[in-house]
UniProtKB/Swiss-Prot annotation:
It holds the Pfam family Tom37. Associates with the mitochondrial contact site and cristae organizing system (MICOS) complex (also known as MINOS or MitOS complex). This is Metaxin-1 homolog. The gene is mtx-1. It comes from Caenorhabditis briggsae. It comes from the Eukaryota.
Length: 312
């Protein structure tokens, strides 16, 4: 079985939310899946990564997380994901997964795909540099439109409010535990890790959601725990990512500087006093009177007679 995911960066084995969820889940149950870092989403049935290709047999590639979890449960490895959960715990896991999809995932989409500053500075540049031209233009446009459709026209304030509440709910549920269902990871842990890790690790000029996440130390600890135990990077990956760090720092710094400059310009424009309203009203009144008189004379409503004086 092969798991095709987007390449690694920013201290993560992959920066894509779904790819992280698939990878984390496979590692948590020690599945002998072969991981393939790929930048060829067109090979997937839905044109997206991750994709699970089953080498033996003619089974179709899998791109759905729940179906992948079912496959892992039947693979026969010693550690079976979610095996120790009771019926009630499984129902709670499903409910929580649905809650996160509707309240946290939209904010993740907005952060990386709908926020123009983040998109232009990080998302667009990263994907464009990993995909060949002109396919990168097509893919980015398609992915961005898909994200906007999923957001459904929600405003930024509403999206962030739901996400902040979801993060607080996650923090409360985790508490002092190592994982969300005790001391053993479940598919919920893989799901949550996929949402949180990019928010925590990828540098962004608009970082409101990152700041909120960083204010939940147990969630930060959770991400670091999963990363160190199940998803450590190789020396080659660390060196490659280190070589790109200065470039990303430069891009983020420039984006933040441009953002502050634009804010300063906007504030300066707002500080310029408007023309006195009384003067405008007087000028408007005079102009209206002149036009009214001219119109009346032109249409004959007002007649002007000129009498010539007869010389004696």
């Amino acid at each position: 079985m092969e798991l095709h995911i987007w390449p690694s960066d920013f201290g993560l084995p992959t920066i894509d939310v779904s790819s992280l969820q698939f990878l984390a889940c496979s590692k948590m149950c020690a599945s002998p899946v072969r991981v393939v870092q790929s930048a060829r989403p067109w090979r997937s049935p839905n044109g997206e990564l991750p994709m699970v290709a089953q080498i033996d047999g003619n089974a179709k590639p899998v791109t759905d997380f729940e179906k992948f979890v079912d496959i892992l449960k039947k693979c026969g490895q010693d550690v079976v994901i979610d095996a120790d959960l009771t019926t009630i715990e499984r129902a709670q896991l499903d409910a929580f997964s649905c809650y996160l999809h509707h309240n946290l995932y939209p904010a993740v989409l907005h952060t990386f795909w709908a926020d123009d500053l983040n998109y232009n500075t990080v998302t667009q540049y990263w994907y464009a540099s990993h995909l060949h031209f002109p396919y990168n233009l097509y893919y980015l446009e398609k992915r961005k439109k898909k994200a906007l459709r999923m957001l459904g026209g929600k405003n930024d304030t509403e999206i962030l409010k739901d996400a902040f509440m979801a993060l607080n709910t996650l923090s409360t549920k985790l508490g002092d535990n190592k994982f969300f269902c005790g001391n053993k990871p479940t598919s919920l842990d893989a799901l949550v890790f996929g949402y949180l890790a990019p928010l925590l690790r990828v540098p962004l000029p608009n970082d409101r959601l990152q700041v909120q996440l960083s204010a939940c130390p147990n969630l930060v600890r959770f991400v670091e725990t999963v990363s160190s135990i199940y998803l450590p990077l190789s020396e080659d990956e660390l060196k490659r990512q280190q070589s790109n760090r200065k470039m990303w720092q430069s891009r983020i710094s420039k984006a933040k500087a441009d953002k502050e400059a634009a804010k300063t310009t906007e504030e300066a424009a707002e500080a310029i006093p408007d023309e006195p309203p009384m003067r405008d009203a007087i000028l408007f009144t005079i102009g209206a009177l002149v036009l009214s008189v001219a119109f009346a004379i032109h249409t004959g409503l007002i007649q002007v007679s000129v009498e010539e004086e007869i010389a004696e």
